[in-house]
Regions:
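Substrate/ligand-engaging "lid" and interaction regions
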Residues: 1-525
């Protein structure tokens, strides 16, 4: 049986798959008559997280409007994963214990491509007074202005960049009476609302300067009572479609569950598989109202609290643990993160980094408990066998990640004084492990290709001449790296950690098959 509106009626009696009970036809009529929510970015994080929130409100009778989703970059997603299935999708929640929840999501009322016809639909929606918010999951690159400066010379309605198109759509709303609206980035990048606001304002300034827009439009954009750009923190892993999940759905009676690659290399399917844990924290600044998403688990708070939650996640409770697992996971030749965390030594290592060295200096938000967050990460999220995240994916661009994932913690210890930073063991051990990784030889002595990193070639060049079992001149080779504040937030020698990292590195490079012995030695202290 193919996934479509007709199937929903058939499946309502089945306990294995949860189906919505609301009248979707009625919801569609109400939504198109007076839309409240437009979303840009039709990928998995939207389908597997954002759309499920509104689905819950509809199911609970707390809203009578759905979402209109727009795809501007990879319109094949609409053609292959939305239109053939009446804009429905199966949300599959992958749990740590191996069980799954399957639910049909019906909250997407219309899917729009950025072609000529779609463009006219978007202008119509933006001009509607009822529109409360426009949200985005377009990745951090989507907010770039520098790549599209040629757009400044075009007419606004002919813009080729999403940020230019968004600016023009906001201008259409302004010209139609200037009703308030919230423009909300839900992308996984810090200060995302600021990035979005700066991009829109830059386009507006350039077009105003060239006489293509009214000067007063800038005032409209800069008044938070009329146009707001709330910040947010989002956290949920929604990997590409999993073949095991596909097989499970076919066994459950779905006929067509193809996993297809679009022409722009996006893997799509009529289903989305995702982990069970999810967080969405949003600055509560919505000048035209908003759906009551707090009833679906979204946390609404101040901008300061959003930023504190982001720092907690990125600097202490998730990302540093990910990087530690990725480094030693690559060295020990693990293919997935759940395999890596299944090694008791690596599990202990991330526990020590998180609980013992991270939590004492964590940026602690009021709305999320850092201890509980780490506990979920270590006990539920990282060991999830369905997620299939790879150490080799996470290890990419580590030179850019180190200053945030470990540097902020090191700076916090430095500010405390009393030589507390010198007492750290496990963060310096991870730094030594990263230098060991840069040699391009795993623990068994086999060569591998070091992952992509903008500073990778320079760092590897600095370590030339160091081999397993031949590690003279360690200080000479490591000093330029360990003293580099742009890598670690501090000069590791000046804070009393440089020599310690050198010592750990010497042990990690003493021979083949020593890494687990070194980890065991320091974890047992």
């Amino acid at each position: 049986v193919k996934l479509n509106q007709e199937l929903v009626t058939t499946l309502k009696s089945q306990k294995e798959i949860r189906c919505f009970n609301y009248d979707r036809k009625k919801i569609k009529t109400a939504t198109l008559a007076a839309p409240i929510w437009l979303h840009f970015g039709a990928g998995n994080i939207f389908r597997g997280f954002i759309a499920t929130l509104q689905n819950q409100l509809l199911e609970d009778g707390k809203s009578d409007k759905g979402i209109i989703v727009v795809e501007t970059y990879d319109t094949g997603i609409i053609d292959l994963a939305y239109k053939p299935y009446d804009d429905l999708n199966v949300s599959v929640t992958l749990k740590r214990d191996g069980s799954v929840n399957k639910e049909i999501i019906g909250s997407v009322i219309e899917s729009v491509k950025s072609d000529k016809e779609g463009w006219q639909r978007l202008i119509h929606f933006f001009e509607e007074d009822s529109l409360q918010m426009v949200t985005f999951t377009i990745t951090e690159k989507g907010y770039s202005v520098s790549s599209y400066e040629t757009d400044f010379e075009r007419e606004p309605e002919a813009s080729e960049s999403l940020m230019g198109q968004l600016t023009y759509l906001c201008y259409c709303r302004y010209k139609k009476g200037g009703k308030p609206i919230a423009v909300v980035s839900l992308d996984n990048c810090s200060q995302n609302g600021k990035k979005l606001q700066e991009a829109v304002c830059k386009f507006a300034e350039e077009w105003i300067k060239r006489g293509k827009m009214d000067a007063a439009f800038k005032t409209y954009l800069q008044d938070p009572k009329r146009v707001s750009f709330p910040w947010s923190m989002i956290d949920k892993i929604t990997p590409q479609p999993n073949k095991k999940v596909q097989e499970m759905l076919i066994k459950a009676g779905f006929e067509e569950m193809p996993i297809i690659k679009t022409s722009k290399n996006t893997w799509v399917a009529p289903f989305v598989n995702a982990e069970e844990i999810q967080y969405l924290v949003i600055e509560d600044s919505f000048p035209n109202g908003r759906p009551c998403l707090e009833d679906a688990g979204v946390i609404f708070t101040t901008r300061e609290e959003v930023e504190r939650t982001e720092k907690m996640k990125v600097c202490t409770c998730l990302n540093p643990l990910h990087t530690a697992l990725a480094i030693f996971g690559c060295l020990l030749d693990y293919k997935t993160i759940d395999e890596a965390v299944g090694n008791p030594l690596l599990l202990q290592l991330i526990e020590k980094i998180g609980y013992e060295e991270g939590l004492p200096v964590v940026t602690s938000p009021a709305m999320v408990n850092p201890y509980h967050f780490i506990k979920e990460v270590i006990e539920i999220r990282l060991p999830n066998p369905f997620i299939l995240d790879s150490p080799w994916r996470i290890i990419a661009d580590t030179s850019l990640k180190m200053p945030i994932r470990f540097g902020e913690t090191l700076k916090a210890y430095k500010r405390q004084g009393e030589n507390k930073i010198e007492q750290l063991t496990y963060i310096p051990l991870v730094i030594a492990g990263w230098c060991r990784y840069l040699l391009g030889i795993n623990d068994a002595g086999k060569a591998y290709e070091v992952g992509p990193d903008p500073r990778g070639a320079i760092l590897q060049k600095a370590l030339e001449g160091l081999y397993l079992g031949k590690n003279e001149n360690i200080s000479l080779k490591l000093a330029p790296i360990l003293s580099d504040e742009s890598l670690f937030g501090v000069n590791l020698y000046e804070v009393g950690l440089g020599t310690k990292v050198e010592h750990y590195f010497a042990e990690l490079t003493a021979d083949k098959n020593v890494i687990q012995k070194v980890l065991d030695k320091y974890l047992m202290q």
